[in-house]
Amino acid sequence: MSPIRSKKKIKNEPRLTVDDVNVVPPKKIRPAIKGTVVGNFMEWYDFGIYGYLTVTMTAVFTQGLPQEWQLLAVMFGFAVSYLVRPLGGLVLGPLGDKVGRQKVLYVTMAMMAVSTALIGLLPTAASIGAWALVLLYLLKMVQGFSTGGEYAGATTYVAEFAPDRRRGFFGAFLDMGSYLGFAAGASVVAITTWVTTHFYGATAMEDFGWRIPFLTAIPLGIIAVYLRTRIPETPAFENNQDEPNAVVEKDTEDPYARLGLAGVIRHHWRPLLIGIAIVAATNTAGYALTSYMPVYLEEQIGLHSASAAAVTVPILVVMSLLLPFVGMWSDRVGRKPVYATAVAATLILMVPAFLIMNTGTIGAVLIALSMVAIPTGLYVALSASALPALFPTASRFSGMGISYNISVSLFGGTTPLITQFLLQKTGLDIVPALYIMFFSAIAGVALLFMTESSQKPLLGSFPTVETKSEAVEIVKNQDEDPNIDLSHMPFPDEENVGAEKQNA
């Protein structure tokens, strides 16, 4: 990480001008955010479907397996998709840094929609035996590969497009879309379950009903891909492309352009580790609340599948709608204080939440889920604003792809599988709570080494504002403003520019 620099003006230091500042008015921000959020909605819509159909799909895809392995075999579908995510990040991250964020986001959206719909067309184990489960895993791997670039690209895109002073607010809409997508998936499963069982009998979901939610990805995917084709490229990426001789962090040169992923890992190992720790805490809580909760409520609490789906929807919707307000709060007080609050809330609330949940009443379950949602919401609201700010523009997509996907694949996506396995082995009802608390404690340590990024331009980028008057204000106060560090901005190298003019 770069050392703290003095604000004292240095001779020949580049000066920020009004033309350098990116002015992105709200009328340009809104469609860009909308086109990005739809991808996260689609991704988590699939998680909602798969999570709430896990028990049903056990009967469809695991015939012939020992009973104690059937549920774990379907839950392994979660894990296998996440194990592939780092590969998607390693391939799509550098590609996004090279060809642009918008192009990669278009491709990931198309892959995700097609693979989700194809799951709904798979033959069952009754038709082709174990090959049904193999094909399911293959399609989950395609999903994992695409989402390996999707979230890293989406957070990078939103962070680079959002004004510096409101990055937390606009970034929170990305994860609002995620959890609304999950709630939508849960709602579709609940409605489909009720309709099919009511009109076609108790086995209707296993016979054909499970396919319907996956096939709804076809119209949703068409809309999402269309919206992705209409989003512009980010100003930060375009500025980085326009300035091939840019000088950023001279004394801590970013070697990504020369060394690729090896350079990102070698030079940015500290923000990578910080990102991995924070993402692990965020996603163990997030996936426990979403992907694992349907299984826990059915298998451990004894709720009917439709009730297990329905009871989490209001919690997810309310939490989702509050995320922009948490993001706005982080713009005022900073990302680190909000993250610290999330860590403390996790350590205090998680065990009582699972103890209350195991009393078994619907009221108790709602209270317990609300308690789990508090730290989860505090964590996820900051992901799109805090995590991309750890890395400079030239390697932001790659850095996000590595840190986010490694952490999610090892600690987030495996949460349902690992917690269910530990629960079966120990019989301890609070195992999920202890698992979540462990990773939050690690995140608390990582926060000690994290640099505050609220209100500041992204590393390797010029400031981004909403109005011309803000740009004028920043230029006027650039020497006094503690949030402006000219050494991290992509000014042209005067020597190289002069040499190019001489050779022209």
UniProtKB/Swiss-Prot annotation:
Membrane topology classification: Multi-pass membrane protein
Summary of activators and inhibitors of this protein: Uptake is activated by osmotic stress. Inhibited by CCCP.
GO CC terms, sorted: plasma membrane
Record keyword Membrane present: yes
Residue span of region Disordered: 477-504
Assigned keywords, A-Z: Amino-acid transport, Cell membrane, Membrane, Stress response, Symport, Transmembrane, Transmembrane helix, Transport
Domain of life: Bacteria
GO molecular function, a single term: symporter activity
Gene Ontology terms: biological process: amino acid transport
InterPro entries in the cross-refs: H+-coupled_symporters, MFS_dom, MFS_sugar_transport-like, MFS_trans_sf, Sugar_transporter_CS
Cellular localization per UniProt: Cell membrane
Bilayer-spanning residue ranges: 41-61, 71-91, 118-138, 169-189, 207-227, 272-292, 309-329, 337-357, 362-382, 399-419, 430-450
Record keyword Secreted present: no
Up-regulation conditions: Induced upon hyperosmotic conditions, resulting in an increase of its transport activity.
Protein's job: Involved in the uptake of osmoprotectants. Can transport ectoine and proline. Protons are probably the coupling ions.
Family: Belongs to the major facilitator superfamily.
UniProt name for this protein: Ectoine/proline transporter ProP
Organism: Corynebacterium glutamicum (strain ATCC 13032 / DSM 20300 / JCM 1318 / BCRC 11384 / CCUG 27702 / LMG 3730 / NBRC 12168 / NCIMB 10025 / NRRL B-2784 / 534)
Gene: proP
